[in-house]
């Protein structure tokens, strides 16, 4: 079991470049872990909404860190090429949410205008 935190990033900054470097390293490490065990679980706050189902207001956030196409492409590979499973999505089905983060502004929690940025990825 691996617990991970990926910082949120910020478009056009070194912080975003660091986030991409971390996600790149995950692409290398995740298959290595799977070679050593049939049961690998990676959990944590990864600060990326993978699909439109993972963020309530996805259209307005397409150019913001956390929902950039480049970030989402890493998750396509985690759940595609590398073969990990998105446990929460499998349990919830193809429906919006369940969200794991809400802004403190604009009554986001009250309106369930959240993001799903926390994951349980399993082999």
Spans of model-derived segments:
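Intrinsic structural disorder
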Residues: 2, 31-33, 123
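Short, positively charged
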Residues: 19-20, 121
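Metal-dependent phosphoesterases centered on the DNase I-like endonuclease/exonuclease/phosphatase
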Residues: 22-117
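Active-site-proximal beta-strand elements of phosphoester/diester hydrolases
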Residues: 1-10
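Short, solvent-exposed loop/turn segments at secondary-structure boundaries
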Residues: 13-18
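Anionic group-transfer/hydrolysis microenvironments
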Residues: 5, 47, 120
């Amino acid at each position: 079991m691996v617990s991970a935190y990926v910082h949120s990033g910020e478009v056009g900054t070194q912080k975003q470049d660091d986030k991409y470097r971390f996600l790149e390293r995950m692409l290398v490490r995740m298959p290595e872990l799977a070679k050593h065990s049939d049961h690998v679980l990676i959990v944590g706050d990864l600060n990326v909404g993978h699909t439109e189902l993972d963020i309530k207001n996805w259209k307005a956030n397409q150019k913001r860190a956390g929902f950039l196409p480049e970030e989402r492409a890493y998750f396509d590979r985690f759940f595609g090429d590398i073969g990990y499973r998105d446990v929460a999505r499998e349990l919830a089905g193809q429906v919006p949410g369940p969200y794991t983060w809400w802004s403190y502004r604009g009554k986001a929690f009250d309106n369930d205008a959240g993001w799903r940025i926390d994951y349980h990825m399993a082999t």
